[in-house]
Structure formats: C-alpha cells, structure tokens
C-alpha cells in the first residue's frame, strides 16, 4: 500500500476532500528519492501532479538545499513532461532505484537540484 512504508515522507494534494495526487519520498544520505508520484486516473491531466511537486519542492527548500532524484519510465511521456515542467532534468540515461541501488535501463534518472 502506498502509505505503509516506514521512514518515508508523504505529500498529499486534496481537492474537495478527495486525494488527487500523492508523493512518497525517502531520505537517502544527502538527497531525497522520489519513490512514487501517484495521481488517480480520473484526476490526471489537470495539473495536480505538478502542483503537488511544486508544493513539495517549496516545502523542502524552506528547510535548506534540495536534491531530489527519481526514476521515470522512458515511455511515460506525461510523467516526463510533469517532471521537466517542475524543474527536473534527465541526469542519467538509465535510472537508479536507490533503495536497492539497482540500475534500470527502461527508466531515466531524473534530478531536481537547488542550493
């Protein structure tokens, strides 16, 4: 289940008391790993994932510098566009799933970085 992993930070965006987007972050060494960004199908293409990412970035930046990494499927054009719109860039041709330190050649390693 999305919200059951211990030692993670969760961000939730609600509209009219309905969950429209959620993100799960893991702190790994000196960066955050965006392990999941979920938007239910009926709420997609409304800008909710971008809104949530921007709010998350703002919150993290208020605490200091921000270094967020993520893996996004090379075929998920919507998620790639959302990440880029929010300031992420492709840092690695093959994504790294940091919790297990495994490389996935079907994903890009995305990164958001600001000091």
Model regions and ranges:
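Acetyl-CoA-dependent GNAT
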Residues: 1-35, 40-41
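Short hydrophobic/aromatic beta-strand or adjacent loop that forms the aromatic wall/cage
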Residues: 8, 105-111
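A generic structural signal for beta-strand entry/edge sites
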Residues: 29-31, 67, 96, 107
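A short, internal acetyl-CoA/4′-phosphopantetheine-binding micro-motif in the GNAT/acyltransferase core
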Residues: 37-45, 72-75
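Conserved acetyl-CoA-binding loop-helix of GNAT-fold acetyltransferases
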Residues: 39, 45-58, 81-85
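Conserved GNAT acetyl-CoA-binding A-motif
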Residues: 60-72
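Conserved catalytic-core motifs of GNAT/GCN5-like acyltransferases
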Residues: 71-72, 89-106
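Short beta-strand-to-coil "C-cap" segments at the C-terminal boundary of structured domains/repeats
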Residues: 100-101, 111-115
């Amino acid at each position: 289940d999305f919200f059951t992993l211990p030692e993670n930070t969760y961000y939730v965006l609600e509209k009219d008391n309905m969950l429209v987007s959620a993100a799960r972050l893991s702190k790994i060494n000196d960066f955050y790993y965006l392990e999941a960004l979920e938007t239910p199908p009926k709420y997609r293409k409304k800008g909710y994932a971008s809104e949530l990412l921007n709010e998350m970035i703002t919150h993290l930046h208020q605490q200091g510098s921000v270094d967020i990494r993520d893996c996004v499927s090379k075929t998920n054009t919507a998620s790639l566009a959302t990440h880029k719109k929010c300031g992420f860039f492709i840092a690695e041709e093959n994504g790294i799933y940091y919790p297990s330190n495994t490389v996935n050649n079907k994903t890009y390693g995305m990164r958001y970085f600001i000091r």
